């Protein structure tokens, strides 16, 4: 099918600029939003401020907006659920949730990451929202490019299956650049795949 290109924005002004340029949907990137507000990436920007910025972005245009929530702002699945509810209140129609720890970048266990995604899905369902949960896995992002191989692909697919069962709608695989591995992933993944170029 035809890929959907998401324009990353960081404030209301960049959202309007992207809309004027022909974007059909918008996304935020955690790094750019944090930097624009004087913070470093990795959930250092307070969640309340992120939601204020998100609400200004969603009000700036009529386009759907998905928000980068990093790992969900909190140690427990219940914290993730609260973050999802707040993002829905701020006008988001979806989010990215990553499977690594914000402080260290280390990957969470598959079971822990899936539990956080399941909590996110329950929160969206409770809100009655048609909310797209894009499960980000950092399997390739954390590995040097010269180590990208079938082993990492298999790990990514195992996570994709677990995340799909937990209620995720999409799979985001930053760091994956090999056309051959992208083709293999999209052919086998139970979820639609998002890559970053």
Where are the language model's segments positioned?
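Alpha/beta enzyme core
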Residues: 1-195
């Amino acid at each position: 099918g035809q890929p959907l290109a998401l324009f990353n924005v960081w404030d209301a002004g960049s959202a309007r600029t992207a809309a004027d340029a022909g974007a059909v949907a918008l996304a935020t990137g955690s790094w750019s939003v944090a930097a624009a507000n004087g913070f470093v990436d990795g959930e250092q920007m307070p969640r309340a401020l992120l939601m204020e910025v998100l609400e200004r972005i969603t009000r700036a245009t009529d386009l759907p907006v998905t928000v980068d929530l990093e790992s969900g702002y909190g140690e427990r699945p219940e914290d993730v659920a609260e973050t999802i509810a707040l993002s829905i209140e701020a006008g988001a129609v979806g989010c990215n949730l990553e499977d690594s720890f914000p402080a260290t970048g280390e990957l969470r266990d598959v079971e822990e990451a899936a539990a956080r995604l399941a909590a996110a899905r329950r929160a969206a369902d409770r809100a009655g929202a048609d909310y797209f949960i894009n499960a980000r896995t950092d399997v390739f992002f954390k590995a040097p490019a010269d180590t990208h191989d079938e082993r990492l692909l298999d790990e990514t697919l195992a996570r994709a299956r677990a995340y799909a069962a937990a209620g995720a709608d999409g799979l985001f695989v930053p760091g994956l650049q090999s056309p051959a591995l992208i083709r293999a992933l999209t052919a086998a993944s139970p979820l639609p795949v998002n890559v970053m170029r």
